[in-house]
């Protein structure tokens, strides 16, 4: 009997426990990382970053038709079910303008990362087209390698380097471009020291040695920025005003509920017409994203029905 994970979006493909026998057939590397729980059930050694990477390879190949996926050491290895949840909830948000899922949406991923995870899921699940921005040339090279290694993705995903220090949308959204939505998983910590402390806590909780903790723990731009998550999203909100007619919905993950009030204040200051909070849950982990738009209901309907 398969147990369901509480809180996942109804369209998320990962409600049931992992079918490890099938996933090991898809990616035989995964077999070496299987372990038994105290209850005698087969599981994956989630404390081992190499095991998580092998699991991701199998999940992306089996569920999302991404046969060739890899990331360099030192970059974040994201949990696939949680990333998929953001995509599915975003699809629901876009559907509110017309009452049906938007099949040909154009999405901007701020900080696409070396893993390119959101575009990979969004292209497969909804046929969306993505532009991914990134400050790190190494991350961009990794994401491009994934795109090039999987047939069809070159037509659906394009990448852009953010060359302007501190900018988010400026320099990425071109003059005559339009996007149905933006998405972002912002850096959480406010300093390198805080990021190291967070990684150390995670290492101790998982029982990792220091060498293991370095694998897929995350790069500086993935983990921290000056002022942390709130400062990053505030900057995003302030910049978004300049693209009010080119983007229907701006969205960002927010890691902590207590970070919302200062963000709501900035959204009021910039004149956002509508603000939405979407709560999500993956097992015991609670998360959320906020979305804001400068368009009213009729303007959003017209935007969705524009010539593409």
UniProtKB/Swiss-Prot annotation:
Specifically methylates the adenine in position 1618 of 23S rRNA. It is found in: Cytoplasm. It comes from Escherichia coli (strain SMS-3-5 / SECEC). Keywords: Cytoplasm, Methyltransferase, rRNA processing, S-adenosyl-L-methionine, Transferase. Its main location: cytoplasm. GO terms for biological process: rRNA base methylation. This is Ribosomal RNA large subunit methyltransferase F. One of its GO terms (molecular function) is 23S rRNA (adenine(1618)-N(6))-methyltransferase activity. InterPro entries: METTL16/RlmF, rRNA_lsu_MeTfrase_F, SAM-dependent_MTases_sf.
């Amino acid at each position: 009997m398969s147990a369901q994970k509480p809180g996942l979006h109804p369209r998320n493909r990962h409600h049931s426990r992992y079918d490890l026998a099938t996933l090991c057939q898809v990616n035989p590397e995964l077999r070496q990382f299987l372990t038994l729980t105290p209850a005698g059930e087969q599981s994956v050694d989630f404390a081992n970053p190499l095991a998580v990477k092998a699991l991701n390879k199998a999940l992306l190949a089996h569920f999302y038709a991404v046969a060739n996926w890899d990331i360099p050491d030192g970059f974040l290895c994201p949990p696939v079910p949680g990333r998929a949840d953001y995509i599915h909830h975003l699809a629901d948000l876009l559907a509110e303008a017309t009452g049906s899922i938007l099949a040909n949406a154009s999405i901007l991923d701020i900080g696409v990362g070396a893993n390119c995870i959101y575009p990979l899921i969004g292209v497969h699940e909804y046929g969306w087209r993505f532009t991914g921005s990134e400050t790190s040339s190494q991350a961009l090279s990794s994401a491009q390698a994934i795109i090039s290694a999987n047939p069809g993705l070159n037509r659906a995903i394009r990448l852009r380097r953010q060359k302007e220090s501190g900018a988010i949308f400026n320099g990425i959204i071109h003059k005559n471009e339009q996007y149905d939505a933006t998405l972002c998983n912002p850096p959480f910590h406010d300093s390198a020291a805080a990021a190291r402390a967070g990684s150390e806590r995670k290492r101790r909780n998982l029982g990792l040695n220091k060498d293991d903790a370095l694998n897929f723990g995350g790069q500086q731009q993935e983990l921290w920025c000056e002022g942390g998550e709130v400062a990053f999203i505030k900057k995003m909100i302030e910049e978004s005003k300049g693209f009010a007619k080119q983007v229907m919905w701006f969205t960002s993950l927010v890691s902590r509920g207590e970070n919302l009030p200062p963000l709501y204040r900035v959204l009021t200051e910039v004149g956002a017409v509508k603000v939405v909070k979407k709560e999500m849950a993956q097992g015991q982990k609670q998360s959320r994203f906020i979305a804001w738009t400068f368009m009213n209901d009729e303007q959003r309907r017209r935007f969705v029905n524009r010539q593409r």
